[in-house]
């Protein structure tokens, strides 16, 4: 049977309630009914907190949407064109740089007047990021001016905020270049006008603002809104970049990378950036004095009205805490000791001067940060950049007695790593003794970061690691083969490894194990011996399996590095690779081990000859493979087949250069004997006596005679 038509949802309920109200008679009730006006009055009151805020939140969202300007949408043809342009830039299949430059100019011409639409478009905002990364300084500044006046809304937009961030990073080196060569730019402009005429096109229009003024305009545009931008999910990323640019800090540094962007962000710069651009953002930059003044004012405005309680709450805020980390790193690292002593600074408001020694509240706050996933990041920043006096008090009061239990915790261990990187040799030795009882549990749970840091810092500080080596040997067992399999994670056979794809957590454990083995090999004494004996205990099949593992092969390459202390170890290990050179050379990871065998046999030439002969016997297979050809070239096998004597001298290290013989300077004359030098001096004197008027010949002849013995000594 056909069903009766019924309206569903809120519309049906609304119509039913309306009919009921129309049918029912209005009855006077003795109770006072709350009206909508009274509801609004109550909502307007300061002390009233409504329980049902669903409607209010909707109104606020609608109000925010109304405040945000709408820049329009791209039509279908425009979206299709810009999508194809994005794919073309990603493929980067241009014939030359001029072809690429012309294509970028054509895209800019097509995007003229649509820049804001593209930046706010979900499908085309990535094109804007790629364009910015490939643009010239003049194009970057022109786009900067297009965005000016709209930054307050763009930095809060889900897609446009990434374009703003990319624009700031690309424009930061332009500020430094304009500071360094302002006069040269004027000369270039005059020369361009003289060459092209007054109507000729310039690479950089004369009426463009300097990049410094563009950045100052952004700060003034955002001024007065720092309070809510600090914890805004999209704007906070842009604020962090802006702070680092004003301070002249590196934008691609490892310590700053985690506070600039999340792990989920697509790395567009890896596709588009050049080596020179990458170098400019990895280094500290010189900034004008106006940036320093603006930075101080910006930090004071950001923290204005934030008392100690609010700052401590901000320390564990997932969005506000990274901004606080950048502010603290700038205050403690760039603004000098005077700013640290200032009671109005963010650092002193967060942690007062007498907190650690007299007040328990401050100590409790710092203790709570150890176990918080967000707060521990802030604590790492404080440990890394805090003044020495504060760090010593902090270590003595908070960390020293409980460093063992902190190292055992999954989150607090990262703070312990930063502490170990900064302590003195005596404190490091006492910290090792405190952490030793936790070594078995750390090994069992594969928490190897702390152990690796202890080994690295002990190598730098020349601390004693005998007790640590014994603890690791007891934790991993005395059997060398089992120990090696456990550390490097090679328990599965090759067939199992091919069929089963490793999980991310397992891969991370294997990576930490490989890094631990490399650190142990670099440390002197029993730690290196423990890994070396494990490699010697492994059969050939396990060694080849390790060599073909992309993670574990790094440890094997480290073990093969030649040094005076491991000559006997290499003499015993290298014959295990007889008959395996072709197999290793054709593998992606094994080819790196094959390359490492060249340096490993630098003082064992008879082994190097045997391995080179194996490569020569499998020449056809190696030449058919890209990896094999690379190994053939690195082992100088063409020289081995044609000029065995030159190859032997290179194998013995007498000729360290791996350049072919024709590239050498053929015009160099052979070294003269002492008799030839004496004859040259005699001839020079005789020539000088025959031509007494010549003033240049005497000194020149004398110079040749005196410089020849030094050249002879160099040749000998």
Swiss-Prot record:
Q: Where in the cell is it found?
A: Nucleus, Nucleolus
**Could you tell me which SMART domains the record lists for this protein?**
Pumilio
Compositional bias annotation for Basic residues: 1-11
Composition bias type Polar residues, residue spans: 657-666
Q: Locations of Basic and acidic residues compositional bias? A: 12-37, 52-61, 687-699
A Pfam family per the record: PUF_NOP9
Example of a GO MF term: RNA binding
Q: Does the keyword Cytoplasm apply?
A: no
**Single GO biological process annotation from the record:** endonucleolytic cleavage in 5'-ETS of tricistronic rRNA transcript (SSU-rRNA, 5.8S rRNA, LSU-rRNA)
Q: Which family does the record assign?
A: Belongs to the NOP9 family.
This protein is called Nucleolar protein 9
**Native species:** Arthroderma benhamiae (strain ATCC MYA-4681 / CBS 112371) (Trichophyton mentagrophytes)
């Amino acid at each position: 049977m056909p069903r009766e038509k019924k309206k569903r949802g809120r519309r049906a309920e609304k119509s039913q309630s309306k009919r009921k109200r129309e049918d029912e008679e209005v009855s006077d009730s003795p109770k006072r009914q709350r009206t909508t006006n009274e509801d609004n009055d109550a909502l307007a009151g300061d002390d009233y907190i409504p329980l049902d805020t669903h409607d209010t939140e909707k109104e606020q969202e609608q109000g925010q949407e109304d405040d945000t300007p709408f820049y329009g949408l791209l039509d279908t043809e425009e979206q299709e064109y810009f999508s194809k342009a994005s794919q073309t830039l990603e493929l980067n299949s241009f014939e030359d740089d001029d072809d690429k430059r012309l294509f970028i100019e054509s895209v800019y011409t097509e995007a003229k007047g649509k820049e804001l639409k593209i930046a706010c478009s979900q499908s085309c905002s990535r094109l804007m990021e790629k364009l910015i990364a490939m643009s010239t300084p003049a194009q970057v500044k022109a786009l900067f001016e297009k965005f000016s006046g709209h930054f307050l809304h763009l930095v809060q937009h889900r897609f446009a905020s990434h374009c703003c961030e990319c624009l700031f990073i690309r424009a930061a080196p332009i500020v430094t270049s304009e500071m360094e060569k302002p006069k040269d730019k004027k000369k270039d402009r005059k020369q361009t006008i003289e060459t092209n005429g007054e109507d000729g096109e310039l690479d950089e229009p004369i009426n463009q603002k300097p990049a410094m003024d563009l950045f100052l305009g952004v700060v003034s545009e955002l001024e007065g809104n720092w309070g809510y931008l600090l914890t805004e999910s999209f704007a906070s990323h842009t604020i962090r970049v802006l702070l680092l640019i004003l301070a002249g800090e590196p934008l691609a540094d490892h310590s700053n990378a985690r506070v600039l962007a999340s792990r989920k962000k697509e790395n567009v710069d890896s596709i588009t950036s050049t080596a020179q651009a990458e170098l400019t953002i990895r280094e500290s930059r010189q900034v004008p004095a106006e940036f320093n003044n603006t930075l101080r004012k910006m930090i004071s405005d950001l923290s204005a009205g934030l008392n100690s309680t609010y700052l401590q709450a901000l320390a564990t805020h997932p969005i506000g805490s990274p901004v606080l980390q950048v502010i603290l790193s700038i205050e403690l690292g760039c603004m000098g000791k005077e700013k640290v002593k200032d009671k109005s600074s963010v650092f002193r408001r967060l942690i007062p001067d007498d907190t650690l020694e007299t007040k328990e509240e401050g100590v409790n706050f710092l203790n709570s940060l150890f176990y918080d996933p967000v707060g521990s990041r802030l604590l790492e920043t404080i440990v890394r950049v805090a003044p020495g006096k504060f760090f010593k008090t902090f270590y003595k009061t908070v960390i020293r007695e409980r460093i063992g239990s902190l190292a055992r915790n999954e989150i607090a261990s990262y703070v312990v790593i930063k502490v170990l990187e900064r302590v003195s040799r005596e404190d490091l030795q006492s910290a090792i003794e405190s952490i030793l009882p936790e070594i078995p549990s750390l090994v069992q749970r594969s928490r190897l970061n702390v152990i690796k840091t202890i080994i690295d810092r002990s190598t730098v500080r020349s601390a004693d690691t005998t007790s640590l080596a014994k603890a690791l040997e007891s934790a991993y067992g005395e059997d060398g083969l089992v120990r090696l399999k456990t550390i490097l994670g090679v328990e599965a056979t090759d067939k199992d490894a091919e069929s089963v794809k490793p999980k991310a957590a397992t891969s991370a454990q294997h990576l930490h194990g490989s890094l631990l083995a490399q650190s142990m090999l670099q440390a002197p004494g029993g730690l290196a011996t423990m890994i070396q004996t494990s490699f010697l205990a492994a059969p050939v099949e396990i060694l080849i399996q390790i060599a073909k593992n992309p993670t574990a092969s790094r440890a094997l390459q480290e073990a093969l590095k030649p040094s005076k202390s491991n000559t006997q170890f290499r003499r015993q290990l290298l014959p295990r690779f007889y008959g395996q050179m072709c197999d290793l050379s054709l593998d992606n990871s094994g080819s790196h081990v094959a390359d490492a065998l060249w340096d490993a046999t630098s003082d064992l030439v008879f082994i190097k000859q045997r391995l080179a002969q194996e490569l020569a016997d499998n020449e056809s297979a190696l030449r058919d493979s890209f990896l094999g050809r690379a190994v053939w070239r690195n082992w100088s096998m063409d020289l081995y087949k044609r000029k065995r004597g030159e190859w032997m001298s290179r194998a013995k290290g007498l000729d360290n250069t791996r350049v072919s013989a024709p590239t050498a300077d053929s015009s160099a004359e052979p070294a003269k004997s002492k008799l030839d030098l004496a004859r040259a001096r005699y001839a020079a004197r005789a020539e000088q006596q025959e031509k007494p008027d010549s003033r240049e010949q005497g000194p020149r002849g004398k110079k040749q005679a005196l410089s020849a013995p030094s050249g002879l000594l160099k040749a000998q």
